[in-house]
Amino acid sequence: MSTKKTKTEDKTLDQQTEQTPVTAAETAPKTRDLDNLPEDKIVRTPLPSKTLRDMRTQFIRCLNAKYIHTDNDGDYAIEESRDGKTLYLLFQWTRTAYDWISNFDFVAKPYKDMEITWRCHRGFLRVWKSIKPFVKDAVANPKYTKIYICGYSHGAAIATLAHEYVWFNRPDLRSKENPDGITGYGFGCPRCYFGSILPWKKMPQELAQRWVRFYPIRNLTDIVTHVPPRIFGFRHVAPVVQLGRTDKWQIIDYAPNFPPRVAMHCDPNYLLSLDDGIKEAQELEAYQKEVKRANNLAAKKAASKKTVPGSGSKEEK
Protein backbone atom coordinates (compact mmCIF):
# COMPACT_ATOMS: atom_id res chain seq x y z
CA MET A 1 0.00 0.00 0.00
CA SER A 2 1.38 3.42 -1.00
CA THR A 3 2.34 5.85 1.78
CA LYS A 4 2.66 8.91 -0.48
CA LYS A 5 0.56 11.92 0.52
CA THR A 6 -1.57 13.78 -1.97
CA LYS A 7 -1.45 17.58 -2.35
CA THR A 8 -4.84 17.80 -0.66
CA GLU A 9 -3.57 15.86 2.36
CA ASP A 10 -0.46 18.07 2.56
CA LYS A 11 -2.62 21.19 2.46
CA THR A 12 -4.86 19.86 5.24
CA LEU A 13 -1.82 18.97 7.36
CA ASP A 14 -0.39 22.47 6.88
CA GLN A 15 -3.66 24.01 7.99
CA GLN A 16 -3.63 21.88 11.14
CA THR A 17 -0.02 22.58 12.08
CA GLU A 18 0.09 26.29 11.20
CA GLN A 19 -2.82 27.48 13.27
CA THR A 20 -3.22 31.17 14.03
CA PRO A 21 -2.50 31.98 17.70
CA VAL A 22 -5.69 32.41 19.69
CA THR A 23 -6.09 35.50 21.86
CA ALA A 24 -7.11 35.44 25.50
CA ALA A 25 -10.32 37.23 24.56
CA GLU A 26 -11.29 34.48 22.13
CA THR A 27 -10.49 31.65 24.53
CA ALA A 28 -12.02 33.16 27.66
CA PRO A 29 -14.65 31.00 29.32
CA LYS A 30 -17.87 30.91 27.31
CA THR A 31 -20.14 29.98 30.20
CA ARG A 32 -22.97 32.38 31.00
CA ASP A 33 -21.68 34.79 33.61
CA LEU A 34 -23.67 37.63 35.11
CA ASP A 35 -20.39 39.55 35.46
CA ASN A 36 -20.85 40.41 31.79
CA LEU A 37 -23.53 42.92 32.72
CA PRO A 38 -22.43 46.55 32.08
CA GLU A 39 -22.02 47.50 35.73
CA ASP A 40 -19.88 44.46 36.55
CA LYS A 41 -18.28 43.62 33.23
CA ILE A 42 -15.12 41.72 32.33
CA VAL A 43 -12.22 43.32 30.48
CA ARG A 44 -11.31 40.83 27.77
CA THR A 45 -9.22 43.28 25.74
CA PRO A 46 -5.52 42.34 26.00
CA LEU A 47 -3.67 44.72 28.31
CA PRO A 48 -0.29 46.22 27.34
CA SER A 49 2.68 44.04 28.25
CA LYS A 50 4.01 46.87 30.43
CA THR A 51 0.86 46.76 32.60
CA LEU A 52 0.98 42.96 32.83
CA ARG A 53 4.65 43.02 33.83
CA ASP A 54 3.83 45.56 36.51
CA MET A 55 1.00 43.32 37.74
CA ARG A 56 3.40 40.39 38.01
CA THR A 57 6.01 42.43 39.86
CA GLN A 58 3.50 43.67 42.43
CA PHE A 59 1.97 40.20 42.84
CA ILE A 60 5.37 38.71 43.69
CA ARG A 61 5.98 41.59 46.09
CA CYS A 62 2.64 40.80 47.74
CA LEU A 63 3.44 37.09 48.05
CA ASN A 64 6.89 37.70 49.57
CA ALA A 65 6.05 40.53 51.96
CA LYS A 66 6.60 40.31 55.73
CA TYR A 67 3.15 40.96 57.14
CA ILE A 68 2.20 42.61 60.41
CA HIS A 69 -0.74 41.15 62.32
CA THR A 70 -3.49 43.34 63.85
CA ASP A 71 -6.83 42.84 65.58
CA ASN A 72 -9.58 41.07 63.62
CA ASP A 73 -6.80 39.14 61.88
CA GLY A 74 -5.84 42.05 59.69
CA ASP A 75 -2.50 41.43 57.96
CA TYR A 76 -0.70 44.23 56.16
CA ALA A 77 2.78 45.25 55.02
CA ILE A 78 4.27 48.63 54.18
CA GLU A 79 7.24 48.90 51.81
CA GLU A 80 8.84 51.66 49.81
CA SER A 81 11.00 51.89 46.71
CA ARG A 82 14.77 52.42 46.87
CA ASP A 83 14.43 56.09 45.98
CA GLY A 84 11.83 56.53 48.73
CA LYS A 85 9.22 58.00 46.37
CA THR A 86 6.90 54.99 45.94
CA LEU A 87 4.82 53.43 48.71
CA TYR A 88 3.54 49.86 48.61
CA LEU A 89 0.52 48.85 50.72
CA LEU A 90 0.17 45.06 50.72
CA PHE A 91 -2.55 42.85 52.18
CA GLN A 92 -2.34 39.14 52.93
CA TRP A 93 -4.57 36.32 51.75
CA THR A 94 -6.82 34.14 53.96
CA ARG A 95 -4.59 32.69 56.66
CA THR A 96 -6.62 31.80 59.76
CA ALA A 97 -10.04 30.56 60.79
CA TYR A 98 -10.97 34.11 61.75
CA ASP A 99 -10.20 35.21 58.19
CA TRP A 100 -12.75 32.67 56.98
CA ILE A 101 -15.31 34.05 59.43
CA SER A 102 -14.71 37.52 57.98
CA ASN A 103 -14.97 36.17 54.43
CA PHE A 104 -18.41 34.71 55.06
CA ASP A 105 -19.72 37.67 57.04
CA PHE A 106 -21.16 39.31 53.94
CA VAL A 107 -23.96 41.29 55.52
CA ALA A 108 -24.15 44.69 53.77
CA LYS A 109 -23.01 47.40 56.19
CA PRO A 110 -23.14 51.18 55.52
CA TYR A 111 -19.65 52.66 55.15
CA LYS A 112 -19.73 56.35 56.04
CA ASP A 113 -16.08 57.35 56.40
CA MET A 114 -15.40 58.39 52.79
CA GLU A 115 -17.93 61.22 52.35
CA ILE A 116 -20.22 59.19 50.09
CA THR A 117 -22.05 56.51 52.08
CA TRP A 118 -22.17 53.12 50.41
CA ARG A 119 -22.89 49.60 51.59
CA CYS A 120 -19.98 47.22 51.98
CA HIS A 121 -19.18 43.60 52.88
CA ARG A 122 -19.22 43.76 56.70
CA GLY A 123 -16.42 41.25 57.32
CA PHE A 124 -13.95 42.96 54.97
CA LEU A 125 -14.87 46.39 56.33
CA ARG A 126 -14.19 45.25 59.90
CA VAL A 127 -10.72 43.99 58.94
CA TRP A 128 -9.88 47.17 56.99
CA LYS A 129 -10.88 49.40 59.92
CA SER A 130 -8.47 47.47 62.16
CA ILE A 131 -5.62 48.08 59.67
CA LYS A 132 -6.35 51.69 58.70
CA PRO A 133 -4.81 53.36 61.80
CA PHE A 134 -1.48 51.67 61.04
CA VAL A 135 -1.21 52.86 57.42
CA LYS A 136 -2.74 56.35 57.53
CA ASP A 137 0.55 58.13 58.40
CA ALA A 138 2.37 56.47 55.51
CA VAL A 139 -0.45 57.34 53.10
CA ALA A 140 -0.42 60.98 54.25
CA ASN A 141 3.36 61.34 53.81
CA PRO A 142 3.84 63.83 50.92
CA LYS A 143 7.22 62.35 49.96
CA TYR A 144 5.38 59.51 48.22
CA THR A 145 4.45 60.51 44.67
CA LYS A 146 3.21 57.04 43.74
CA ILE A 147 1.24 54.54 45.85
CA TYR A 148 0.57 50.91 44.95
CA ILE A 149 -2.18 48.97 46.73
CA CYS A 150 -2.03 45.22 46.21
CA GLY A 151 -3.75 42.22 47.77
CA TYR A 152 -4.43 38.58 47.04
CA SER A 153 -7.69 36.73 47.77
CA HIS A 154 -8.98 37.99 51.15
CA GLY A 155 -6.28 40.67 50.94
CA ALA A 156 -7.58 41.81 47.54
CA ALA A 157 -10.90 42.78 49.14
CA ILE A 158 -9.03 44.76 51.80
CA ALA A 159 -6.98 46.39 49.01
CA THR A 160 -10.27 47.48 47.41
CA LEU A 161 -11.15 49.49 50.52
CA ALA A 162 -7.59 50.73 50.99
CA HIS A 163 -7.57 51.98 47.40
CA GLU A 164 -10.61 54.17 48.05
CA TYR A 165 -8.98 55.50 51.23
CA VAL A 166 -5.84 56.52 49.33
CA TRP A 167 -7.91 58.05 46.52
CA PHE A 168 -9.90 60.12 49.03
CA ASN A 169 -6.97 61.28 51.16
CA ARG A 170 -4.36 61.91 48.44
CA PRO A 171 -6.04 64.01 45.72
CA ASP A 172 -2.58 65.09 44.54
CA LEU A 173 -2.00 61.54 43.26
CA ARG A 174 -4.92 61.79 40.84
CA SER A 175 -4.33 65.31 39.57
CA LYS A 176 -3.67 66.26 35.94
CA GLU A 177 0.03 66.50 36.78
CA ASN A 178 0.09 62.98 38.28
CA PRO A 179 -2.93 61.01 36.97
CA ASP A 180 -1.28 57.62 37.57
CA GLY A 181 -0.21 58.28 41.15
CA ILE A 182 -2.49 55.54 42.53
CA THR A 183 -2.59 51.98 41.18
CA GLY A 184 -4.37 49.04 42.77
CA TYR A 185 -4.29 45.31 41.97
CA GLY A 186 -6.67 42.79 43.51
CA PHE A 187 -5.65 39.22 42.59
CA GLY A 188 -8.46 36.71 43.04
CA CYS A 189 -10.60 39.54 44.35
CA PRO A 190 -13.98 38.84 45.98
CA ARG A 191 -16.85 41.29 45.62
CA CYS A 192 -17.22 43.80 48.44
CA TYR A 193 -19.56 46.49 47.08
CA PHE A 194 -23.27 45.97 47.76
CA GLY A 195 -25.33 47.54 45.01
CA SER A 196 -28.70 45.96 44.47
CA ILE A 197 -30.29 42.61 43.70
CA LEU A 198 -31.67 44.37 40.60
CA PRO A 199 -29.14 43.62 37.82
CA TRP A 200 -29.74 46.87 35.91
CA LYS A 201 -28.94 49.15 38.85
CA LYS A 202 -25.43 50.60 38.43
CA MET A 203 -22.91 52.03 40.85
CA PRO A 204 -23.15 55.86 40.96
CA GLN A 205 -20.49 57.48 38.77
CA GLU A 206 -19.20 59.71 41.59
CA LEU A 207 -18.44 56.52 43.54
CA ALA A 208 -17.17 54.42 40.61
CA GLN A 209 -14.50 57.00 39.70
CA ARG A 210 -12.68 56.16 42.93
CA TRP A 211 -11.60 52.81 41.48
CA VAL A 212 -10.69 53.89 37.95
CA ARG A 213 -7.10 52.77 38.59
CA PHE A 214 -8.01 49.61 40.51
CA TYR A 215 -7.86 46.22 38.74
CA PRO A 216 -9.85 43.28 40.16
CA ILE A 217 -8.08 40.32 38.54
CA ARG A 218 -9.51 36.88 37.78
CA ASN A 219 -7.62 33.80 36.58
CA LEU A 220 -9.90 31.87 34.23
CA THR A 221 -13.02 30.98 36.26
CA ASP A 222 -11.51 31.41 39.74
CA ILE A 223 -14.44 30.81 42.08
CA VAL A 224 -13.33 33.35 44.71
CA THR A 225 -13.90 36.21 42.26
CA HIS A 226 -17.56 35.16 42.01
CA VAL A 227 -18.37 35.53 45.71
CA PRO A 228 -20.43 36.81 47.39
CA PRO A 229 -22.93 35.89 44.65
CA ARG A 230 -24.52 38.64 42.58
CA ILE A 231 -27.94 37.32 43.54
CA PHE A 232 -27.25 38.75 47.02
CA GLY A 233 -26.61 42.19 45.54
CA PHE A 234 -22.79 42.25 45.56
CA ARG A 235 -20.70 43.68 42.71
CA HIS A 236 -17.09 44.32 41.83
CA VAL A 237 -16.07 47.96 42.12
CA ALA A 238 -14.43 48.03 38.67
CA PRO A 239 -14.33 45.93 35.47
CA VAL A 240 -12.69 42.54 36.10
CA VAL A 241 -9.45 41.81 34.24
CA GLN A 242 -9.57 38.26 32.85
CA LEU A 243 -6.31 36.31 32.86
CA GLY A 244 -5.66 32.86 31.42
CA ARG A 245 -6.65 30.83 28.39
CA THR A 246 -9.05 27.92 28.41
CA ASP A 247 -6.86 26.09 25.89
CA LYS A 248 -4.14 26.03 28.59
CA TRP A 249 -6.31 24.93 31.48
CA GLN A 250 -3.85 22.18 32.44
CA ILE A 251 -1.82 24.72 34.39
CA ILE A 252 -4.03 23.82 37.35
CA ASP A 253 -1.67 20.87 37.88
CA TYR A 254 -0.19 23.00 40.67
CA ALA A 255 -3.23 22.03 42.74
CA PRO A 256 -4.26 18.58 41.45
CA ASN A 257 -6.43 17.72 44.47
CA PHE A 258 -8.70 20.75 44.12
CA PRO A 259 -11.66 21.23 41.77
CA PRO A 260 -10.58 23.31 38.73
CA ARG A 261 -12.33 26.52 39.80
CA VAL A 262 -10.61 26.33 43.19
CA ALA A 263 -7.22 25.41 41.72
CA MET A 264 -7.40 28.44 39.44
CA HIS A 265 -7.26 30.60 42.57
CA CYS A 266 -3.82 29.25 43.59
CA ASP A 267 -1.00 31.79 43.27
CA PRO A 268 1.28 29.65 41.01
CA ASN A 269 -1.54 29.49 38.46
CA TYR A 270 -1.96 33.26 38.57
CA LEU A 271 1.76 33.64 37.87
CA LEU A 272 1.60 31.21 34.96
CA SER A 273 -1.36 33.04 33.45
CA LEU A 274 0.44 36.36 33.86
CA ASP A 275 3.53 34.94 32.12
CA ASP A 276 1.36 33.67 29.28
CA GLY A 277 -0.43 37.03 29.04
CA ILE A 278 2.84 38.96 28.93
CA LYS A 279 4.17 36.77 26.12
CA GLU A 280 0.94 37.09 24.15
CA ALA A 281 0.84 40.87 24.62
CA GLN A 282 4.47 41.22 23.48
CA GLU A 283 3.74 39.18 20.35
CA LEU A 284 0.69 41.32 19.60
CA GLU A 285 2.62 44.55 20.13
CA ALA A 286 5.44 43.36 17.85
CA TYR A 287 2.89 42.50 15.16
CA GLN A 288 1.15 45.87 15.52
CA LYS A 289 4.50 47.65 15.33
CA GLU A 290 5.37 45.80 12.13
CA VAL A 291 1.97 46.59 10.60
CA LYS A 292 2.39 50.27 11.50
CA ARG A 293 5.87 50.32 9.95
CA ALA A 294 4.59 48.70 6.75
CA ASN A 295 1.67 51.14 6.55
CA ASN A 296 3.97 54.14 7.04
CA LEU A 297 6.30 52.84 4.34
CA ALA A 298 3.39 52.36 1.94
CA ALA A 299 2.11 55.86 2.71
CA LYS A 300 5.54 57.38 2.00
CA LYS A 301 5.76 55.57 -1.34
CA ALA A 302 2.29 56.76 -2.31
CA ALA A 303 3.15 60.33 -1.33
CA SER A 304 6.44 60.27 -3.28
CA LYS A 305 4.64 59.22 -6.47
CA LYS A 306 2.28 62.19 -6.20
CA THR A 307 5.15 64.66 -5.78
CA VAL A 308 7.34 63.49 -8.71
CA PRO A 309 8.38 66.66 -10.71
CA GLY A 310 6.59 67.06 -14.06
CA SER A 311 3.93 64.44 -13.36
CA GLY A 312 0.75 65.28 -15.20
CA SER A 313 2.37 68.26 -17.02
CA LYS A 314 1.56 66.94 -20.51
CA GLU A 315 -2.13 66.66 -19.69
CA GLU A 316 -2.14 70.24 -18.34
CA LYS A 317 -0.57 71.52 -21.56
Language-model regions: role of each:
Residues 4-7, 14-150, 154-312, 316-317:
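Non-catalytic, mobile gating and regulatory segments of ester bond hydrolases
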